[in-house]
């Protein structure tokens, strides 16, 4: 099954996540089909906290990709910010 989920990056104590489209059987930070955005939970000041390519996210959702719980929240938040 194709899923949209977060892949962790960054360094110790400073998480940074990429929103990735991947096969659900692949490791969390492993192989992916496409990166469609990023999420920086500890962004401060003028740093961008969330960036999502809405067109690609809509495409993958229309193709049957299942977002994780957290990604579903982030997509909703990004759609609200874009409107």
Curated annotation (Swiss-Prot):
Keywords: Ribonucleoprotein, Ribosomal protein. GO terms for cellular component: cytoplasm; small ribosomal subunit. The keyword DNA damage does not apply. The keyword Ribonucleoprotein applies. One of its GO terms (molecular function) is structural constituent of ribosome. One of its GO terms (biological process) is translation. InterPro entries: Ribosomal_bS16 (IPR000307), Ribosomal_bS16_dom_sf (IPR023803). Belongs to the bacterial ribosomal protein bS16 family. HAMAP family: Ribosomal_bS16 (MF_00385). This is Small ribosomal subunit protein bS16. The lineage of its organism: Bacteria, Pseudomonadati, Pseudomonadota, Gammaproteobacteria, Pseudomonadales.
